[in-house]
């Protein structure tokens, strides 16, 4: 999608915008249901690796007092806080190991 957006593909840009808005809307629903949050965590494939997606999603959450540290947001492959120290909600990236989780669950069943 990024390559298509760079080539000026409007459908790709719309798909990207809908994805980011949908994630922010989903987060907002949980924020409302829980009457606020202390932290938001990005994980798994997109959450860990799609730096622009994280930035765009967080941009929708400004009403929560969330501010993004753009340098920290550029880090990949490690557990890191990507919000600024003065952000009212901590935002982090936590890498996952889905294969290990599946293995542990399987061992527990066997």
Regions found by a protein language model. Give the residues of each.
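A glycine-rich helix N-cap at a beta->alpha junction
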Residues: 62-66
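Short, glycine-/Ser/Thr-/acidic-enriched flexible segments
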Residues: 8, 47-48, 98, 108
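Glycine-rich phosphate-binding/hydrolytic loop that grips phosphoryl groups
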Residues: 73-110
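Flexible, glycine/charged-enriched surface loops at secondary-structure junctions
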Residues: 30-38, 68-73
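Glycine-rich phosphate-binding loops at beta-strand->alpha-helix junctions
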Residues: 38-60
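Active-site proximal loops enriched in glycine and acidic residues that flank catalytic Cys/His/Asp
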Residues: 2-5, 16, 41-46, 95, ...
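Adenine-nucleotide phosphate-binding core of ATP-dependent small-molecule kinases
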Residues: 1-33
